[in-house]
């Protein structure tokens, strides 16, 4: 009898853990950013910072770019990643989009955008090092407000990165999200590459 009760308790615990895991993945990836979401309404008052040198930042008086300027009336592919100069981001994620840029243009995409929780000056140097600035528009989310608004923020203090973002991608048409993908973990690169989003356009 005691053994039967123990087995039932263990089974209940396993089911609870499995349900929690499913809920965690769902809420993390899709609670605020889902198909049909107006990305500008989901992040009201939020602006991004276009990648540039420090001198360009000074001359522009550290101006920012409203989300409406980025998305309204345009077909945009946007992907977010944990940080400039990090492994998967540098070796796989950005190169994936850079190498497929002609395919995006052939599908009528107006811009391919990379956004990261970094200042725009660090991102600028990184983009130049990757030789990707001519193909991809890079933006900083220096205070993380954009990702927090979309429910895509992620604490990566364990990797000495602090508050960052999930690894994700989306196809956005006139501000409305048409497709969105979020990795199970920021270190994964399974569903957010260029080939996946190309198949969703």
Curated annotation (Swiss-Prot):
GO terms for molecular function: peroxidase activity; thioredoxin peroxidase activity. PANTHER family: PEROXIREDOXIN, PEROXIREDOXIN-2F, MITOCHONDRIAL. Residues 37-201 form the Thioredoxin domain. It comes from Arabidopsis thaliana. The modification Phosphothreonine is found at residue 37. Keywords: Antioxidant, Mitochondrion, Oxidoreductase, Peroxidase, Phosphoprotein, Redox-active center, Stress response, Transit peptide. The active site is a conserved redox-active cysteine residue, the peroxidatic cysteine (C(P)), which makes the nucleophilic attack on the peroxide substrate. The peroxide oxidizes the C(P)-SH to cysteine sulfenic acid (C(P)-SOH), which then reacts with another cysteine residue, the resolving cysteine (C(R)), to form a disulfide bridge. The disulfide is subsequently reduced by an appropriate electron donor to complete the catalytic cycle. In this 1-Cys peroxiredoxin, no C(R) is present and C(P) instead forms a disulfide with a cysteine from another protein or with a small thiol molecule. This is Peroxiredoxin-2F, mitochondrial. One of its GO terms (biological process) is response to oxidative stress. The lineage of its organism: Eukaryota, Viridiplantae, Streptophyta, Embryophyta, Tracheophyta.
